[in-house]
Amino acid sequence: MVPDGMSFLQLFLIAVVQGLTEWLPISSSAHVLLASDFMGLVGRDEVLINAASNTGTLIAMLLYFRKDVGAAILGGFELAATPVTKRPLSAGARLARCIIVATPFALIGAVIYESIAPETLWTALRSVYAVAASTILFGALLWWADARGGQSRSEGDMTLRDAFLIGASQLVAVIIPGTSRSGITMTAARALGYERVEAARFAMLIGAPILAAVSLYGLMGLAGAPAGGEGATIADGLIVAAIAFVSGYASIGLLMTLVRKMSFLPFVLYRFALGIALLATSPIVAGAIG
């Protein structure tokens, strides 16, 4: 039973939206933002439900890529114990090093988002027109990079320079809603010539520390968040996390299956359709978001 007024349908839709869109290159923030606003989630409700859905999708990714995650964790210990000039690093240590190099940029972007730029800028970037425009624009950029990028580079070819560039691209996604963090990092990796499977895999792996930080930040913010209208409870959060886990795991499997067989074009076309739909319904959506 779903307590305190929140319907199971509300919880189910928010969780499925987050789970399906977090790892696909189609902007989870735009989808969750619109879904939350349409359902009237505010204050503590929104913080709790978003933190729970983020946690569910994070666990899904960690489980799906458990071998890579395990190798990276062991590689991190290897990095700490191995002087720079000593023996060659294992594949796990090289992966851990690239993740470490790529991760901070999203956190830097979050600091900028929260504390530096004026509120008027964030209001403008959060408008339906800005979200629609970035959804279409960065979809076109993914299309270009996917068509231009080769398929000659794989996991073993990842350099610190490449990790730096892929990581730096996350700044755009953090600052501009609708960009898609996973989408922009896959775009950067494809532009650098990494094969599609590798681009998708690395984009998701470097998202793990970021999503963990976002989830923790959201949970820490529960105490100070104003009460929401529906009275979301911890039980609601657990339901959302479980559903987001299932849908997130399924979406990762779908993505990895598709990129092994075809290009990113289906996601590009979806972004175009979403952007056009947002613009077409802008009087209604603008009122909901604004």
Language-model region placement:
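Multi-pass membrane proteins that catalyze or facilitate reactions on polyprenyl-/lipid-phosphate substrates
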Residues: M1-G290
